[in-house]
Amino acid sequence: MKPNKPRYIACSHCSKAKARCDRKVPCSRCVSKQLVCHPRSARRAIHTPTEQHLRWLEPGDVPRRDEQQTILLAQQTPVDADNTMVTGTHMRPDSPDVSSQLQSTGASYISADKMTHLSTEWLHQITPESSMHMPLNVPLDQDVTHQSSPDLDLINELIGYPACDDLGTTYMEFVGIGPTDSPPLSPSRDGRSVKDRNSRLVALCPGHPRHWSEDFSSQMRISMQRFEQTINLRQPWTTSCSETWASLPYPSVMNPITETTRDSLVAVSQLLLLQTRSIHLWENGRNSRRLSSGNLAVLNLPPAKVLDSLLRAYTSCFDQYFGLLSSELQDPNDIMTHPEHDLKAAGILLLLMIAIGATANPEPKMHIFAIGMAEMCRTALCDLMEDEVPNTRPDILSHCALLLLYLGMWSGERWLMRIICAHRQIYTQLLHRCPLSFNTNDSLQKLHGGLNLSQQWQHWKEQEMQSRLTYAWMVTDQEWSLVYDTPSNFSVDMMTQSLPNSERLWRATSEGDWAALAPEMFGTQAPTCLRDLYTSFMNHELRPGRSTLPLQYLRLLLVPLHGMVFHLRQWLQSFPNCPVRWRKNNQGLSNPAIHAQLDQVQALLPEWYDLAIHLTNTSPAFVSMLVMYHLIALNAMASFPNIEDALLRGPLDRSQLPNPRGSDPCPLGTCQSTVAEDSAEEALVHCGQILRLVRLMPPSDQPLWWSAVVYRIALITIFLSIKRHPHHWLPAVMLGQMVQDTASSSGTSTDGSGVSLMSNPLFTDRVDAQPHHRPVILNNVAPNDNELLQFTKYREGEPCLAVRDGQLIELRQPRDVMSFFIDLVDGGHLPALHATNFQASVKDSLERLADRWGFLSLHKT
């Protein structure tokens, strides 16, 4: 005789409130409102093959960390009354094995004997967190079933949900956008849709915060829809991305990911996706669909080999510049299984590493995958910061926030860059959870203290990690400040934490190796902080040849130098050039006085360069450091925001005709102070040196912000070229109108098809009347080249840019100069598909700039 199973109807609370009830035990409405659900059953009962008694579940009755339960990826039977997790009613005992169904889709999962152990404490944070996003205009007794958060039944069904089932609705339908509003996903010739190319970044300004004003919620939903479409594809993840980048010299720093670690990442990612969708459900109001197992996406991560390739890309484009990977972080499997790591925070950390590697990959599919992962991790990280989980280490949270901000600022997605810019100050405060300073001799004293060797090593690693994180935040903050022209969040006077130690000591694999290297490193390298190091530099105590500073120390010295230049540049925008009547003559704060201080800072930059050139180092980190030096030197002599504003305005509608003496009209018109009159040649030399270093950097080792440097140098070089050769940079429309006006004023008629602009003596360039100057190549020689020194000191020669094939481009050739920088963004010699999203955005910005000035050339891709 088959037992009877009661048919549940609306519970008591939903019935009294006259609200819709999903008729689960407990129902989603009671769980979201933290109520004790009282289910009711109909008089008639239905027959079911299996039936067990289900107890009433109170919302606070959740298992703790010590009651960890094993979640199997295979089929599960209903649990007894002592368990909290309840199986879904759609699971049938005669259904095929879930693991076999998942294998049919191409995803690899572990067998039943290899189980994924997940802590169930943080899984239930998804349930009450949605109440924070409840609209204020919804009464408590009103039906909120369409906005309800997932209950424990759904979480249990989510882990073992078969990937071959019908996934139902997409993300756009889920958040209330019809299918007709979804943009076409047909790729263009470079793998991206036309609408995506036109809406990724602000026109002519890649991601600059001062141009953001519109709402990006629709772009966020579109990105999440594409992410779900990517992870829901039935075909397996192709290895084209790994095969394309397999030939690149990625160092094998991190150990390969095992299938067990991948399965743990799948489970964590699935729950993060559920959490993100539940939050977006609350934010999109009553038009959204109810969250149910029918419209949930089953996340399918790339294979382990592809994940290994993405982690190698992460080490190339990020970690080799900051050195945050210790011996334990070099193994991604230990990150997930480390007893001191919270599972959710460890999963977010590893997923962000993978997402940064995917951002550096030129495949459009990888970019969509990285943006979706970034949004999921951002939502989860906000919850960790608000809840302040006691078991989560502050350095893990700070590490996750650093990776998230770095990924968001250089992702190329406008909505993500806008959110990250808004959260930049909030994430920076994570560093203040731990004290910023400690005794610099503490590590040396611990060697002779009462702790054993293992405790000494563990104590030193915690302090070293905090030190490296602090200074990594400083370096990334300087990169954001330099590229986006925003103030820095750090000052040198607060940097009292000891500088990082040597890489050999940091990468020690065992406590024995660390103990053998520690006395030597602590004895030869005096522990100091950045504030003391900068004081020694300002006092001229660091001289070339006396002592060789590590590369990381020289990189950190650029942070306060950039801060002084930026601060003085802000002052120059506030003080007028003309004298003010009410000011006293002896007042120190004036425009000339600030220029004098800026000259003093400029005198410090060559001293830093003398220290840097004594390093026998050709690593990508050294090349990146020299690029930062030249950018700071350019900021000291040029105002990039004014240059950018002048170029974005485009040429003037009406230009003043040249006078008989031969002075050419400037197509920029009258603009604010941009470049000092006596620094134009020196600025061109710095631009050429950056272009030379850009060519030396291998494509696999380029940081994510590398193309932003090309954009910055392109605008400065174009501006100086216009100032140097204003006649050649006049658009053809302006030249034609000026010729007609000149001919009509002289009483002659001109044929529109036979007008030769260069034959008019009024438009003959003044350089042509002078003796021929020898070309000075800017981007092919070292800075100590004699021709560059003569050009800087005596202004002799005509600056040129050298192309890869040996041809020279003069700055008086607008189309060739524009084409040179457009091709340089993605390498020029590489196919168009080998451009990341940020590189393609910068390239689009330069193309629009060339089109606005009338010098856009069609390129073969």
UniProtKB/Swiss-Prot annotation:
Q: Which GO terms describe its cellular component?
A: nucleus
Compartment list: Nucleus
PROSITE patterns hit by this protein? ZN2_CY6_FUNGAL_1 (PS00463), ZN2_CY6_FUNGAL_2 (PS50048)
Q: Which Gene3D superfamilies match?
A: Zn(2)-C6 fungal-type DNA-binding domain
> Which pairs are disulfide-linked?
none
What biological process terms from GO does the record include? DNA-templated transcription
What terms describe the molecular function in GO for this protein?
A: DNA binding; DNA-binding transcription factor activity, RNA polymerase II-specific; zinc ion binding
Write the record's keywords in alphabetical order, separated by commas: DNA-binding, Metal-binding, Nucleus, Transcription, Transcription regulation, Zinc
Portion annotated as DNA-binding:
11-37
Query: Do you know which Pfam families this protein is assigned to?
Result: Fungal_trans, Zn_clus
Null mutant phenotype: Impairs the production of oxopyrrolidines A and B.
Q: Which CDD domains match?
A: fungal_TF_MHR (cd12148), GAL4 (cd00067)
Q: What is its main location?
A: nucleus
Q: Does the keyword Metal-binding apply?
A: yes
Question: Does Nucleus appear among the keywords?
Answer: yes
Q: What does this protein do?
A: Transcription factor that positively regulates the gene cluster that mediates the biosynthesis of oxopyrrolidines, polyketide-amino acid hybrid compounds with feature structures of tetramic acid.
Cross-referenced PANTHER family? TRANSCRIPTION FACTOR WITH C2H2 AND ZN(2)-CYS(6) DNA BINDING DOMAIN (EUROFUNG), TRANSCRIPTION FACTOR WITH C2H2 AND ZN(2)-CYS(6) DNA BINDING DOMAIN (EUROFUNG)-RELATED-RELATED
Q: What is this protein called?
A: Transcription factor opdJ
The opening ranks of the lineage are: Eukaryota, Fungi, Dikarya, Ascomycota, Pezizomycotina
Instruction: Name the encoding gene, please.
Output: opdJ
